[in-house]
Amino acid sequence: MNTRLVNKLKTSATCVALASGMMLATAAVADQVTLKSADGTVNLVGDFVEFKDDNYVIRTALGDLRISASRVRCEGAACPQLNDVTADVQIAGSDTIGLGMMPLLMSGFAATLDADAELVNTAAGQTIATLVSDGGFGDEIGSYLVSATSDDDAFAALLGGSAKVGMSSRRITKDEARALRAEGAGNMVSPDQEHIVAIDSMVVITHPSNNVGELSVEQLRGIFSGQITNWQQVGGPNRDINVIAHDNQSSSYDFFMNYLYGEERPNFVPQGIATDDQTASNVVYQDRGAIGYVGFAFQRGAQPVTVVNECGIASKPDAFSAKTEEYALNRRMYLYNRADNLDEASLNFINFAISEAADGVIGKSGFIDLGILRRPQGEDDDRAISLRKEAAAYDAGFEAGVVREMLDEMSDNDRLSTTFRFRTGSAKLDERGRLDLARLVDYLENAPQGTKVTFVGFTDSVGTFEANRRLSLGRAGSVLDEVRSVAGDRVAQIEFAAAGFGEVAPSACNETDGGKAINRRVEVWISSDSAA
């Protein structure tokens, strides 16, 4: 282990505590506990003294510190066993959502009710939000207990009936859905029971002075397995690479390593292990040789790295690519509920979490909301450059003509981040598409008279070129029909059209099922001279 980097990790964590007016203790004894806040700004270590008046008291080198239980959770064998907490609604599952998003979501939800959310951490990973009317001066109108542990626990709690809402940073598995259905929970992947609330992007970061702004998946595999050890090996300076990883029990570690290696993970000890994204970002920012990975909100002053997949397609870590789900290291954040025990309080919270009203607090939490962004498609656009190369590779004929047709259309249209996806050979939208339809109609309702919106279809590479073009046009037409059906007269001022370009302009490799799923899509283009 690199001693210098380990010291940097400790120093970074100390700086975070100092920013909150606190100090980390260095003692390690049997009664030691750690007090952590959900946002990572407080991380205190000391000997447990007592729990009194909803405050933890710990002893550090600076003396006794008193910390409100509403600000932190307690970890360690010496933490007090608090009484079981009862609440109107129990929410359980992913610590990524429970600790990173739920506190602000609860506050935002309360605000829509003209209430205040009083948050108290009752135990490690457990928070109760009590909603009080009249901005906190009235009566209690509801309480929500959030237990943040793991994705698996979301479905176990729903199955056992101990939770009304489950949180997960992955989609429910077929076995989990079948088990719940057998217990009377209903169809767990129906629109009424499966809800996408946000996108989380993992971003590879380096020191801001590092001139390596792009790395291939193969190069990342080499770096995070210890086979590539010097930046010079990937076009950078002659400097040792210091890998900053997450603890192997964290969901961030699991997601990142699964993307690079699947189940066959290397036996490699990194130069530093960060306890959270904030620490990882701070360490990478201070070390010219460091590389790490953090959530989208924690890039800060570090340099984000563009990831190039096995097919040579570059994926930039920006909000637009994340919303289109064309960035390589994306995952959806889900809420789930049973059909047989959903009450009004649970439903009201879920409806808020998936609404546009929640976008602001989701963004503040460090996740990427599902709001719509708009991007020009000029001739200097990365995709336009790639398409010109693709056209040159075809013999003059049908395929080359399709590529040129797409380039002509791009020059007159901007692209919206709303992107609809389909199953293989199907015109049926996936689970996110249903939510995006409603948001798109809301967005287009404000477009000026004469705006032209084109639904542009694409496919994977399964099948012939001509058949895929017909399929892509059919999918684009089906989305257009869905939008008209949902919108009614609300978008009467818009001229709609459909186009299909088949398998050209892939966003991912067609060699994998995941890549094919990304490529089966319908994009939304809007005339450049309009301003929605």
Predicted region positions:
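Extracellular interaction modules
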Residues: 9, 61, 520
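Exported/periplasmic ABC-transporter solute-binding proteins
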Residues: 32-435, 439-448, 492, 532
